[in-house]
């Protein structure tokens, strides 16, 4: 039996290699003279990264580092236990309250990661027998949350409100939920939230919105998709956000009504049974929130980077996106790997994204821009892309 298991594993690994879907971790050391987004590769080669979700360039901010160090000196490194068992630190409570005030909702709850937050929210609020209508390009954690809930999953074509309305019109038993990314992580486009809210109201559905790639980037004070569309945030029932992207830290949160947060605190297994976020990260995230709220100059720099890149490489197979996520659709996995390798030889780090992360025949380069990039960085990327595409 032991050899049969090993043979099965090896066969699966061989299939991954044969289909150009093999993955390996890359060790990148931040370059001492500049730090992110510049790194040193395993062979000592300098690399300029276009693969990070550190959209505002906050991860290397000294103010965040100082806040984390001060909290470590006071409270230690790890939280030591689950929040309901070992208790929160003041930094946790202050951050959660600040996040709720920022978004104009009643309460927020911290989680260890966005994946845990999405699993916890959906498996707690969505019941077996409920109906979930989800965009086909939603993040995997949203799909897994629905599977864990036992609800019936109906996936509508990406951004297709007519298809969603057709599903909703069929009705059925149980509560109805519309679940969507605010900014889609692989394509970079923005969910049509006003239309989603209209359909939700028409058919009595709730909305769960994952703002992982929207917070900090879109809207007034970086408040995300609803702010981008000038919508009242209260048209959304539950909001998830991460602290590891535009915030430049790590962790996640869920925001909404006090009842929603109370229910999650008492019922969400991924909250109850997870070790609390280190308070040093909460302290750093609180500083990041202030920088993010007042980060209009950083957001404007992102817009300028995006516009300049696309203007310099106008004939590239760009996906439609008004966010820092700029996808180059290459189709074939081997083609994506080849272009990625060519960029790396030129000192640019941008890994190929292949199935199952993206649908079949849609392998791509997922180029992510940061306010920490300089104009010269974008020029170098554009020049290299013109040479290799």
From Swiss-Prot:
Top-rank taxon: Bacteria
Keyword line: Biotin biosynthesis, Pyridoxal phosphate, Transferase
UniProt-listed Enzyme Commission number(s): 2.3.1.47
S-S bonds: none
Pfam families referenced in this protein's UniProt entry, alphabetically: Aminotran_1_2
Residues that hold pyridoxal 5'-phosphate according to the record: 114-115, 185, 213, 242
Catalytic activity of the protein: 6-carboxyhexanoyl-[ACP] + L-alanine + H(+) = (8S)-8-amino-7-oxononanoate + holo-[ACP] + CO2
Repressor as UniProt keyword: no
Subunit text: Homodimer.
Reported function: Catalyzes the decarboxylative condensation of pimeloyl-[acyl-carrier protein] and L-alanine to produce 8-amino-7-oxononanoate (AON), [acyl-carrier protein], and carbon dioxide.
Protein family: Belongs to the class-II pyridoxal-phosphate-dependent aminotransferase family. BioF subfamily.
Protein name: 8-amino-7-oxononanoate synthase
Originating organism: Acidithiobacillus ferrooxidans (strain ATCC 23270 / DSM 14882 / CIP 104768 / NCIMB 8455)
Name of encoding gene: bioF
């Amino acid at each position: 039996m032991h050899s049969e298991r090993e043979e099965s594993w090896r066969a699966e690994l061989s299939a991954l290699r044969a289909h150009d879907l093999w993955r390996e971790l890359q060790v990148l050391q931040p370059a001492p003279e500049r730090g992110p987004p510049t790194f040193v590769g395993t062979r000592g080669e300098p690399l300029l990264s276009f693969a990070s979700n550190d959209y505002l360039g906050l991860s290397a901010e000294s103010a965040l580092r100082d806040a984390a160090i001060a909290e470590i000196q006071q409270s230690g490194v790890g939280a030591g236990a689950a929040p309901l068992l070992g208790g929160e630190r003041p930094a946790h409570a202050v951050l959660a309250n600040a996040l709720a005030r920022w978004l104009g909702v009643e309460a927020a709850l911290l989680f260890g990661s966005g994946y845990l937050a999405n699993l916890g929210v959906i498996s707690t609020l969505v019941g077996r027998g409920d109906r979930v209508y989800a965009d086909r390009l939603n993040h995997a954690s949203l799909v897994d949350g629905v599977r864990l809930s036992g609800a019936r999953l109906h996936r509508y074509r990406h951004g297709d409100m007519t298809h969603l309305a057709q599903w909703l019109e069929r009705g059925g038993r149980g509560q109805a939920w519309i679940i969507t990314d605010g900014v889609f992580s692989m394509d970079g486009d923005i969910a049509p939230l006003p239309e989603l809210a209209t359909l939700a109201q028409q058919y009595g559905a709730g909305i769960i919105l994952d703002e992982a790639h929207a917070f900090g980037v879109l809207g007034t004070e970086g408040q995300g998709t609803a702010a981008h569309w000038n919508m009242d945030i209260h048209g959304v029932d539950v909001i998830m956000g991460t602290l590891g992207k535009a915030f430049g830290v790590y962790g996640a949160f869920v925001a909404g009504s006090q009842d929603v947060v109370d229910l999650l605190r008492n019922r969400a297994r991924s909250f109850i049974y997870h070790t609390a976020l280190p308070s040093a990260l909460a302290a750093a995230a609180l500083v990041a929130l202030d920088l993010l709220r007042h980060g209009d100059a950083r957001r404007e720099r992102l817009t300028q980077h995006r516009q300049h890149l696309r203007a310099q490489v106008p004939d590239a197979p760009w996906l439609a996106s008004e966010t820092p996520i700029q996808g180059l659709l290459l189709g074939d996995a081997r083609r994506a790997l080849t272009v990625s390798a060519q960029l790396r030889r030129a000192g640019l780090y941008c890994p190929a994204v292949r199935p199952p992360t993206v649908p079949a025949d849609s392998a791509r380069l997922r180029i992510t821009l940061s306010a920490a990039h300089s104009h010269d960085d974008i020029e170098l990327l554009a020049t290299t892309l013109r040479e290799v595409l």
